[in-house]
């Protein structure tokens, strides 16, 4: 009996163990099923990711479309701005050409030394004569103006003398120390190669200054010749505009009257500047015409000493102021307003002093601001 009882108990225990095993197995199966279910959820996530990628792709496409549209807009805006800038430049150039507003971009700025070659005639001497007084007054010891002088020399003659190499010129230097003759006889070709000039100024024979055909093609050819032999890396070319004769000058009959001569000069110079390599104009002719409109400056014979050449003091100072404001002032960042020189003796007619200095400076500065028009503000 006892054995049977023990056998029954053992059998019961076996059955209980099998049940537990099945329960565990079922649990594993459930876990596996759960895992399987979990694994089956992965495609769902993949679908979500695919949707996200599709959304991102759409967004990228939209951004690219927007960027392309923006790029086209930017390009259109850029082209419009470029066209507007180009038109503004053309209008500015046309304004400078029509009115003569000075454009000083070609000039050197604040050089250690400024060397200017002035190729001309007696009118060039008149323009330079008062420069030493101004330069000395301002303490400017680093400016030299070399004047290559041949009396009554025209542009055509300058060209012919260059080709022939004739030594028919005199060479002068003007600086803060005064005037000195460097050579009694020299040629234009030799002097062109003497120094690395920063600026070269040309002057026409006064009687022909209102005739454009007397300028070209001679001036352009001389500029070409200079460019071949020049020592400087960059040279600015300027032209000194001649003044009209006094109303009683004998040679004025060619132009009928003074005002017409001045207008003819302005027309010829403006046309010459457009056709040649001239960078800027020194408007001495307009400065003189401004001064002739000012009652307080009506001395000598309309600012001339013989009807054609400028008067020795007020006239020469006026020309020097115009030269200074056109060339030296923008290069060296100085103003003619700083000058307080007294030019001439108290007994000299037209002496420059505190009574007329500012008026003469005004006439010069107004001409530099507008090369081809008489200013209503000259007397202020």
Walk through the language-model features, giving the residues of each.
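Conserved SGNH/GDSL esterase-like catalytic core that processes O-acyl groups on lipids
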Residues: 126-216
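Serine-esterase "nucleophile elbow" of acetyl-processing enzymes
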Residues: 72-162
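Conserved catalytic region of serine esterases and O-acyltransferases that act on ester linkages
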Residues: 307-380
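Sec-dependent N-terminal signal peptides
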Residues: 4-13
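Sec-dependent signal peptide cleavage junction
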Residues: 18-106
């Amino acid at each position: 009996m006892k054995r049977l009882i023990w056998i029954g108990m053992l059998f019961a225990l076996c059955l209980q163990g099998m049940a537990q095993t099945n329960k565990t197995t079922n649990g594993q199966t459930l876990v596996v099923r759960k895992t399987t279910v979990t694994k089956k959820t992965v495609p769902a996530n993949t679908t979500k990711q695919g949707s996200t990628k599709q959304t991102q792709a759409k967004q990228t496409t939209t951004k690219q479309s927007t960027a392309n549209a923006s790029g086209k807009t930017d390009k259109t805006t850029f082209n419009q701005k470029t066209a507007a800038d180009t038109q503004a430049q053309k209008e500015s150039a046309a304004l400078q050409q029509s009115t003569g507003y000075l454009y000083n971009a070609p000039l050197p700025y604040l050089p250690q030394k400024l060397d200017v070659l002035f190729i001309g005639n007696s009118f060039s001497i008149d323009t330079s004569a008062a420069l030493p007084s101004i330069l000395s007054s301002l303490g400017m010891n680093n400016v030299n103006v070399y004047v290559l002088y041949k009396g009554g020399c025209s542009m055509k003659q300058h060209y012919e003398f260059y080709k022939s190499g004739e030594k028919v010129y005199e060479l002068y230097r003007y600086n803060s120390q005064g005037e000195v003759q460097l050579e009694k006889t020299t040629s234009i070709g030799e002097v062109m190669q003497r120094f690395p000039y920063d600026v070269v100024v040309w002057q026409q024979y006064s009687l022909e200054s209102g005739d454009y055909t007397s300028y070209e093609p001679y001036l352009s050819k001389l500029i070409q010749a200079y460019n071949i032999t020049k020592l400087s890396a960059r040279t600015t070319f300027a032209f000194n505009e001649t003044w009209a004769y006094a109303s009683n000058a004998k040679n004025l009959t060619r132009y009928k009257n003074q005002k017409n001569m001045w207008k003819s000069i302005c027309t010829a110079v403006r046309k010459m500047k457009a056709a040649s390599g001239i960078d800027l104009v020194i408007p001495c002719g307009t400065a003189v015409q401004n001064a002739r409109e000012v009652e307080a400056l009506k001395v000598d014979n309309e600012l001339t000493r013989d009807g054609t050449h400028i008067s020795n003091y007020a006239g020469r100072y006026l020309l020097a102021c115009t030269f200074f404001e056109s060339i030296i002032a923008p290069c060296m960042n100085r103003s003619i307003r700083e000058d307080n020189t007294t030019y001439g003796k108290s007994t000299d007619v037209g002496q420059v002093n505190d009574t007329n200095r500012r008026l003469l400076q005004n006439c010069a500065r107004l001409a530099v601001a507008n090369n081809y028009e008489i200013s209503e503000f000259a007397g202020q």
